[in-house]
Amino acid sequence: MSNGHVKFDADESQASASAVTDRQDDVLVISKKDKEVHSSSDEESDDDDAPQEEGLHSGKSEVESQITQREEAIRLEQSQLRSKRRKQNELYAKQKKSVNETEVTDEVIAELPEELLKNIDQKDEGSTQYSSSRHVTFDKLDESDENEEALAKAIKTKKRKTLKNLRKDSVKRGKFRVQLLSTTQDSKTLPPKKESSIIRSKDRWLNRKALNKG
């Protein structure tokens, strides 16, 4: 009896050991499968994240490109504005210079005597006739516009030279400018010099006794 009982216990323990071993093997198999599942899911998640990262990178590059283009457009616009402003300043400076020259010429003309102004007008009339004759010639050559501008500049330059020469013979006294006459003009424009004999005769006549002034 005892020997059979011992044998039964041994068989039972062996069976238990075999069952435990089988369970351990099952656990190992399950754990391996879990690892495989986890690893496969990680790979899938990595594959899913890759397009997102690529999308973010491409979106960032596109935004940076748009910012760069916008900055270039702003720089170009600023450059055009500076160029436009510079041209406007140059035009304004030219106009201001022309106005100042015109004002100076008008002041000089206003300070000159009427006789000299008449001489200038006569010279201008002669220049106008000369320019009209040249204008007809240039019309024949189909260059009227350019030549008219050249003639206008020539007349203006000649007029300035005339005024400049006239200013040499004038002296400014306070707010007025006095024209100095040449020796050839003295006898025509200045009054005659006083004669002492004539003055004495006039005084005697005015102070004669017949008047009885006393």
UniProtKB/Swiss-Prot annotation:
Pfam families registered for this protein in UniProt: U3_snoRNA_assoc
InterPro entries in UniProt: UTP16 (IPR013268)
Region of interest (Disordered), residue spans: 1-106, 182-214
Stretches with biased composition (Acidic residues): 42-52
One Gene Ontology MF term: U3 snoRNA binding
One GO location term (cellular component): small-subunit processome
Extent of Basic and acidic residues compositional bias: 1-10, 22-41, 54-75, 192-206
Main localization category: nucleus
Modified residues (Phosphoserine): 16, 45, 65, 144
The family this protein is said to belong to: Belongs to the UTP16 family.
Function according to Swiss-Prot or TrEMBL: Functions as part of the small subunit (SSU) processome, first precursor of the small eukaryotic ribosomal subunit that coordinates the first two steps of ribosome biogenesis in transcription of the primary transcript pre-RNA and pre-18S processing. During the assembly of the SSU processome in the nucleolus, many ribosome biogenesis factors, an RNA chaperone and ribosomal proteins associate with the nascent pre-rRNA and work in concert to generate RNA folding, modifications, rearrangements and cleavage as well as targeted degradation of pre-ribosomal RNA by the RNA exosome.
Quaternary data: Part of the small subunit (SSU) processome composed of at least 40 protein subunits and the RNA chaperone small nucleolar RNA (snoRNA) U3. Interacts with snoRNA U3. Interacts with MPP10.
Further remarks about this protein from its record: Present with 2120 molecules/cell in log phase SD medium.
Protein's name according to its UniProt entry: U3 small nucleolar RNA-associated protein 16
Native species: Saccharomyces cerevisiae (strain ATCC 204508 / S288c) (Baker's yeast)
Designated gene of the protein: BUD21
